[in-house]
């Protein structure tokens, strides 16, 4: 079982390249983050594999999971813990057939229609958003806001993480609205002190659950 409480989605631009993503991951995991996604849409696959293997090494022995965005072949090549797909990527059935049943499969959902189409026998968790508009994913749908997120979370067929300009001040509201965790990019990536930024998010999630 993967701990989705604080789910770090790496951004190579905000982190300053591969080494920056590795350093950010190390800092975040030391602060309690237990799920890290490698997302670099414009990278060649060889670079993704090299970075993925480096991240896998950093995460070894930490109980933190490595998720690969979009690319099932990269997921297998680096022996990642799971794959995350969007609505226009591989179908969940095809993705599951490729990665097998021992890895987790996440899916992005942005509205009620997409939520209604989720097959929870194939999907382990959902990324629901954007909560608010974000510069790190320019093709994201209309913002849900916390109320819109709550409406979707109330019908969740599996665990959900909230994503889209999530910052510490709204973590508690999202958790109380039905989130099983929060996915963040700029709240950790590119911060002057990624370890402190990650710790603040971990503490907000813990506070909301107490």
Q: Model-derived features: where do they sit?
A:
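Conserved N-terminal beta1-alpha1 strand-loop-helix module at the mouth
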Residues: 1-90, 97-124, 141-147, 151-160, ...
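A short, flexible beta-alpha/helix-coil linker loop
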Residues: 12-13, 132-134
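Short acidic/polar capping segments at secondary-structure boundaries
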Residues: 132-133, 166-168
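Glycine/threonine-rich flexible loop motifs
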Residues: 136-138
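Short helix/strand-capping connector loops at secondary-structure junctions
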Residues: 178-186
């Amino acid at each position: 079982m993967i701990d989705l409480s604080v789910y770090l989605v790496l951004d190579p631009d905000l982190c300053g390249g591969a080494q920056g993503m590795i350093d950010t991951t190390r800092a975040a995991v030391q602060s309690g983050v237990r799920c890290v996604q490698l997302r670099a849409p414009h990278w060649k696959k060889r670079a993704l594999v090299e970075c993925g293997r480096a991240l896998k090494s950093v995460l070894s022995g930490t109980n933190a999971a490595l998720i690969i965005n979009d690319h099932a072949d990269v997921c297998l090549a680096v022996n990642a813990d799971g794959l995350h797909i969007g609505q226009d990527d591989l179908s969940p059935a095809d993705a599951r057939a490729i990665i097998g049943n021992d890895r987790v499969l996440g899916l992005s959902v942005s509205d009620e229609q997409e939520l209604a189409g989720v097959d929870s026998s194939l999907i382990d968790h959902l990324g629901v958003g954007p909560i608010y508009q974000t510069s790190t994913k320019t093709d994201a749908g209309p913002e849900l806001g916390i109320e819109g997120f709550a409406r979707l979370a109330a019908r969740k067929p599996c665990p959900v993480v909230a994503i889209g300009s999530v910052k510490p001040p709204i973590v508690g509201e999202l958790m109380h609205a039905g989130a099983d965790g929060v996915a963040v990019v700029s709240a950790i990536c590119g911060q002057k002190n990624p370890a402190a930024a990650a710790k603040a998010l971990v503490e907000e999630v813990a506070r909301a659950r107490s």
